[in-house]
């Protein structure tokens, strides 16, 4: 047998750049192609199937996130957990416009759902977090002063996450009234569950009482005003608000959240919701504004809503809190707005 040396065919740029990552492809795993050769190499073969949400688009726009993640679309913020509940196992055609960065959007094509055994929790010093599969590429600024896509599983302490702000993507087709949005904000902050048959918001701040009272009047609702609370006994309005909240069973401090009708609303409605929410449960000093909540989900949602508006905040917690003479042994979250972002908050939200 005669062996002949064969001249190597010159490799394309894609083949050369992807050679290292191609070697790391895992055996015995199924993948979905991202539609981009280099991205498939970075991922080790494509998008790995798992108990995750794969919102798949072109180039680096796909997501391999666990169901707790939130994405920003032309219909507003969408919790992948909500999609996870309503879509079947496997791959489903799924088209929605997805925000990638400021001024950059893309159209998704599919949603994939399946079991995954491993994921990586990534957290920045400002409290921005994401839970993704180890192969998921994230854009980072490295210690070597380079902007690169790195697998989540290979991130190091000191890598700087590149996070887009001021994407300004809202659902302008939303018909949520701004007076109703304000009432929802105050209710989420200091209200009881409307399932008890009334709207009842505890506050001694006279200016807040007046704002809620007038907002209800503008909606044609008869309000009541007392020394320590404001609300309404209007059954039809109470049921409307309860439905907008998603008919919650638990509505205590640790179970509060931003309703989907607000996450999917216009900028104006989101801004007045945040104004009502934060005015009720915040304090300020000469350094900034501090919003306080017992709900991790609510703190995270507020952080993302503000980021979309261009307001960068810090989110952190402390274990336990003394309220009056009683000690509550669970986490309390703070969203801190300071510096020029406090000025921007005042300008956009008030």
Give short role names for the model-derived ranges:
Residues 2-64:
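The Walker A/P-loop phosphate-binding site
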Residues 64-73, 303, 310, 344-350:
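Short intrinsically disordered, low-complexity coil segments enriched in acidic
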Residues 65-109:
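Long, charge-dense accessory insertions within large macromolecular proteins
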Residues 327-345, 349:
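Polar, glycine-rich mid-to-C-terminal structural blocks
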Residues 1-5, 66-72, 162, 174:
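Generic start-of-chain signal for non-secretory N-termini
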Residues 86, 109-325, 334-335:
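Intein-associated homing endonuclease modules of the LAGLIDADG/DOD-type, together
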Residues 41, 77-80, 146-150:
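Short, solvent-exposed loop/turn positions at domain surfaces
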């Amino acid at each position: 047998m005669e062996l002949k040396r064969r001249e190597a065919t010159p490799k394309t740029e894609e083949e050369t750049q992807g050679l290292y990552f191609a070697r790391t492809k895992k055996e015995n795993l199924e993948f979905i192609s991202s539609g981009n050769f280099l991205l498939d190499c970075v991922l080790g073969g494509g998008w790995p199937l798992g108990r995750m949400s794969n919102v798949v688009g072109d180039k680096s726009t796909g997501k391999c996130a666990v169901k707790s993640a939130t994405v920003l679309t032309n219909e507003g913020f969408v919790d992948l957990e909500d999609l996870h509940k309503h879509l079947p196992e496997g791959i489903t055609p799924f088209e929605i416009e997805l925000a990638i960065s400021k001024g950059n959007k893309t159209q998704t094509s599919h949603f994939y759902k399946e079991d995954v055994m491993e994921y990586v929790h990534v957290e920045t010093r400002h409290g921005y977090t994401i839970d993704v599969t180890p192969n998921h590429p994230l854009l980072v600024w490295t210690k070597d002063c380079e902007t690169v896509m790195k697998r989540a599983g290979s991130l190091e302490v000191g890598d700087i996450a590149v996070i887009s702000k001021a994407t300004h993507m809202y659902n302008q087709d939303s018909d949520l009234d701004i007076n109703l949005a304000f009432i929802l904000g105050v209710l989420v902050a200091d209200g009881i569950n409307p399932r008890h048959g009334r709207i009842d918001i505890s506050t001694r701040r006279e200016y807040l009482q007046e704002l809620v009272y007038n907002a209800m009047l503008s909606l044609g609702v008869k309000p009541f005003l007392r020394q320590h609370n404001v609300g309404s006994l209007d059954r039809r309005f109470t049921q409307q608000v309860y439905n907008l909240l998603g008919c919650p069973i638990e509505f205590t401090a640790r179970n509060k959240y931003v309703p989907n009708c607000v996450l999917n609303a216009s900028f104006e409605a989101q801004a007045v919701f945040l104004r009502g929410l934060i005015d009720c449960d915040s304090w300020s000093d000469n350094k900034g504004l501090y919003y306080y909540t017992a709900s991790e989900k609510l703190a995270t949602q507020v952080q993302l809503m503000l980021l979309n508006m261009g307001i960068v905040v810090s989110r952190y917690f402390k274990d336990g809190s003394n309220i009056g003479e009683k000690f509550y042994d669970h986490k309390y979250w703070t969203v801190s707005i300071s510096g020029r972002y406090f000025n921007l908050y005042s300008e956009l939200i008030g």
